Structures are given as C-alpha cells and as structure tokens.
Amino acid sequence: MAAKDVIFGGEARARMVEGVNILANAVKVTLGPKGRNVVLERSFGAPTVTKDGVSVAKEIELKDKLQNMGAQMVKEVASKTSDNAGDGTTTATVLAQAIVREGMKYVAAGMNPMDLKRGIDKAVHALVAELKKASKATTTSKEIAQVGSISANSDESIGTIIANAMDKVGKEGVITVEDGKSLDNELDVVEGMQFDRGYLSPYFINNPEKQAALLDNPFVLLFDKKISNIRDLLPTLEQVAKAGRPLLIIAEEVDGEALATLVVNTIRGILKVVAVKAPGFGDRRKAMLEDIAILTGGKVIAEEVGLTLEKVTLADLGQAKRVEVGKENTTIIDGAGAAGDIEARVKQIRIQIEEATSDYDREKLQERVAKLAGGVALIKVGAATEVEMKEKKARVEDALHATRAAVEEGIVAGGGVALLRAKQAAGEIKGDNADQDAGIKLVLKAIEAPLREIVYNAGGEASVVVNAVLAGSGNYGFNAANDTYGDMIEMGILDPTKVTRTALQNAASVASLMLTTECMVAEAPKDEAAGGGMPGGMGGMGGMGGMDM
C-alpha cells in the first residue's frame, strides 16, 4: 500500500479552501447576464465553449491532492444541484464558497465547528421555509418563457421555443433537444405515438413525395414473435380484406415467405398492408407493444395469454385514425383505445417511474408516458459552427430543466433577490449558543454572494447594489442586463423555487462538512529522486585466464 500524508487542523483546512477557491473562481465568471465564457480543452477536436457551471466544474482536477479534495467536494455541490434541479449550478458553487470562506474565519477564531454547523442548518431551514412561502405558481406560457430565457443566459428565443413546446405537448410531455440543420432553432411536434422503427420493405411506400406509407383508418395487428410463414397470417388477411381497410403489422420480425407475399399483394393492390418491427428489446419491447395495444384498443397476440395468429378475429386488432410509416419512424395518430384504459396505463407507468433506480430507466418510462398521454416535441438547435452548436445545445437543455423545475415548485424573483428577501422575512433566527448564532450569521451574510457576483461580472459596485436592493422590498431588485432597478417579476427575471432552494441546501451541506474537517489523508507524493539513475557498474568480472579453449 502506498504511503499516505496525514495533515491536521488549520493547515488541512487552508489547503482545502485553496482548492475550493480555484474551482469556484473558474465557475463563477459564468454567473449572470453579463457572465463570461470558459473554454475547455478537448483531447481531440475543437475546444468546448461553455457558460454552464457544472460543465466547468466537471473539467477541473488539481495536481495538489489536498487542494483537489476541496475542489472535488464543491464539484459535488454543482453536480448534485444539476441532478436535482437541472440548473443553478453556478449559484450553488458561489454559495458554497461564500459559506466556507466565512465559516473558516470563525473556526480559526476558535469557535466550535459542530455548533457552527448546527447554526448553518437552522438558518438554511428558516430560509427554505421563506422561499417556499414566497413561491408563486407558474400559470402562463409567458412566465415559462421568461424562466427559460434567464436560464439560457438571457436568450429570449430559447425561452420562447421551450414555452411553445410545452404548450403543444403539455407540461408532462417529452421535449427532446437535437442538432438542427439550419442557423435558426426549430420546433417539431409529433402528435400521437411515434416509435423508432420504419417499414421492412420500401415496396410498402404509397406516397413517393414523403417517401412514406400512409394508412387511413387501419387495423393494427400486434404480435410478439417472428412471422415467417404466410399460412399463419392468412385468416387475418382475409378478414381485413373483406372489411376493405388497410392493415399495419407490428411484430418482432416479418421475413421470408411472409414478407414476400405481403409485398406482392401490396404491389398488385389486392391489400394495403405495411409491416414494421416492434420497438425496443426484451421486456421493454413487451411493455411497448402493450402500450400500443391500449392506445389502439387491441390486444397483443401472445401465446402466454392463449392467443395465436390463426385464431385472430377483427375484435383482437387495434384501430387508429391514421398511421404514417417512414424509413426510420412509425407514427400512430388518434388510436381507438378507451380514454379510461389509457389513463390507467399512464398511472401504472408513473408508479414505475417513482420506483425506478436508474436515470436511464426513468427516462425511458417518462418517454412512454408522454407517447401515451400527449406527444413528443423536438427542439432542433441551429448554429453556424459545431462549437457554437454544442454551447447552445447545453444552454437549451439547462433552460428545459429550469422550466420543468418552475412548473414543479413555482417561481421566485431572480437575480439573487429571493435569497435576500427570505433573509429579511425570516427575521431574527436564534441559536442555542453564541457559536450557533455565528453559524446563522455567516449563512445570512453568504447569501448575498450570488447578487454580488452578478453585479461584479456586470462591472458594477457590488456593495452599493446589495444595499440598494436590501433597502427595497418585495420583488425589487437589480437587472444587471441593463443596469436598472425595478420589480424583477415584471422585468421577467425569474428563478424556479426548486433551483434556488436546492442550490442553498446543497451548498450548505457540503460547506458544513468542510468546516467540521479536522484531518485529511492523501497519498504522499512519490519521491522522484529515489528512482533516478541506473545502479553502479557491474564492477569488472576479474581475469578469466586459464580457460584454455
């Protein structure tokens, strides 16, 4: 086992604070409407330009082991805030640095770190309660657009496109962000259920302009196995042909004789039919087939439930108003499923979302809910270069998370004002002793830090602005974008309550851990000198005389 350095007390904390400052100073230049960019080196390709606090934090690894421990702990603040609220990472980092800085002064003065921590917790608890009281529900599309704009660094076009997407697919709908092809941002909305499987043969295309197969008022056959033998399908095809309607077949696979026969019948115009593969894999495929069955009012033909292809009747088939099948996607519009059944299915999936342990599973389940409930909106981000595209896409994703947080817990005045008003509303918070009072006092001072940093990045005098804002009341604050004072909500400078709350709680949590640290253990630096040079020569091999050949 490698040798370790063990450092105690003030020296350990001082080195940790150095690491905190290096990381926080790099992150906080991005805060506010006049915050600057940070350029991140990439091992290959163009560098990444970002104004996203958590992206900057994740890149930082320090050479000094003890400084690095401090930096990594603050990195945890940023990434936790990003995971929980989706935004507010820079605010959280600034708050953590401010609490650590203030707190270290008290620890150095001989105060009890555990009592300081209890004081910090009391102050945070009181401030969070006030933030929740001040929170206002987001009701209008305009407010959602404003939240998105602020989160995307005052880019109104991003806020507007997110608000439009939420209008179209509802607040629960899935909104995905993709690279666009043009210079402008575009919004595509897919109504109904879309899944990423296209036609199995281009001969099914009946609309050459769209390069797609369009079926009006079709039956939908759902089968969870492979179809290779046309004999299995014949009874179903005959019933559908008699009804004079088209047929969409969704199965694990359709190939061989079965696919060839379907193609021939389509070309000859005997039957309008399209075959596609079922979406997903394994258990997820079964679940998605069941979703489609409920949406279209049909059944999944599976041997497990005693149904076989030969015995299928029209009552077992699903129905839809319209189906569009492209090369890569299939969209089912206006399925004939009962609204009550769809609602029950959505409820069931929501319970699974709450129980899901991995982010990937949760995301896939949320997609299924959206496909059943409303639809999917696609925001295509436009930019001139790839570097700009990456930066803009990250901002759109941040703004999307922020608007979701605003819908969830409401909004408060932005620009660091909500924290100052919470401090005023909380009144006098009392600790059990002088050291706890000091912990409370340091939090109440530290929460000025986000506003101070916004003003500093805008080139203003922080103390003057903070005093002016404290002298006001309600939503009165400072708009750093144009150096004016006024009502923050009216000016459209809003923060989601969840983002502000999470930033404060996470910052205080990690800062408290640092203040109560008394010892640090790190791997000792390797002694470079010890490995230098080759060992001395091999000292002559003596005479080898007498060895007559």
UniProtKB/Swiss-Prot annotation:
<dbReference type="GO" id="GO:0005737">
    <property type="term" value="C:cytoplasm"/>
</dbReference>
<comment type="similarity">
    <text>Belongs to the chaperonin (HSP60) family.</text>
</comment>
<feature type="binding site">
    <location>
        <position position="415"/>
    </location>
    <ligand>
        <name>ATP</name>
    </ligand>
</feature>
<keyword id="KW-0143">Chaperone</keyword>
<feature type="binding site">
    <location>
        <begin position="479"/>
        <end position="481"/>
    </location>
    <ligand>
        <name>ATP</name>
    </ligand>
</feature>
<dbReference type="GO" id="GO:0140662">
    <property type="term" value="F:ATP-dependent protein folding chaperone"/>
</dbReference>
<dbReference type="GO" id="GO:0005524">
    <property type="term" value="F:ATP binding"/>
</dbReference>
<feature type="binding site">
    <location>
        <begin position="87"/>
        <end position="91"/>
    </location>
    <ligand>
        <name>ATP</name>
    </ligand>
</feature>
<dbReference type="GO" id="GO:0016853">
    <property type="term" value="F:isomerase activity"/>
</dbReference>
<feature type="binding site">
    <location>
        <position position="495"/>
    </location>
    <ligand>
        <name>ATP</name>
    </ligand>
</feature>
<dbReference type="InterPro" id="IPR027413">
    <property type="entry name" value="GROEL-like_equatorial_sf"/>
</dbReference>
<keyword id="KW-0547">Nucleotide-binding</keyword>
<dbReference type="GO" id="GO:0042026">
    <property type="term" value="P:protein refolding"/>
</dbReference>
<dbReference type="InterPro" id="IPR001844">
    <property type="entry name" value="Cpn60/GroEL"/>
</dbReference>
<comment type="function">
    <text>Together with its co-chaperonin GroES, plays an essential role in assisting protein folding. The GroEL-GroES system forms a nano-cage that allows encapsulation of the non-native substrate proteins and provides a physical environment optimized to promote and accelerate protein folding.</text>
</comment>
<keyword id="KW-0963">Cytoplasm</keyword>
<feature type="binding site">
    <location>
        <begin position="30"/>
        <end position="33"/>
    </location>
    <ligand>
        <name>ATP</name>
    </ligand>
</feature>
<dbReference type="InterPro" id="IPR002423">
    <property type="entry name" value="Cpn60/GroEL/TCP-1"/>
</dbReference>
<keyword id="KW-0413">Isomerase</keyword>
<keyword id="KW-0067">ATP-binding</keyword>
<dbReference type="Pfam" id="PF00118">
    <property type="entry name" value="Cpn60_TCP1"/>
</dbReference>
<dbReference type="InterPro" id="IPR027410">
    <property type="entry name" value="TCP-1-like_intermed_sf"/>
</dbReference>
<dbReference type="GO" id="GO:0051082">
    <property type="term" value="F:unfolded protein binding"/>
</dbReference>
<dbReference type="InterPro" id="IPR018370">
    <property type="entry name" value="Chaperonin_Cpn60_CS"/>
</dbReference>
<feature type="binding site">
    <location>
        <position position="51"/>
    </location>
    <ligand>
        <name>ATP</name>
    </ligand>
</feature>
<dbReference type="InterPro" id="IPR027409">
    <property type="entry name" value="GroEL-like_apical_dom_sf"/>
</dbReference>
<protein>
    <recommendedName>
        <fullName>Chaperonin GroEL</fullName>
        <ecNumber>5.6.1.7</ecNumber>
    </recommendedName>
</protein>
<comment type="subunit">
    <text>Forms a cylinder of 14 subunits composed of two heptameric rings stacked back-to-back. Interacts with the co-chaperonin GroES.</text>
</comment>
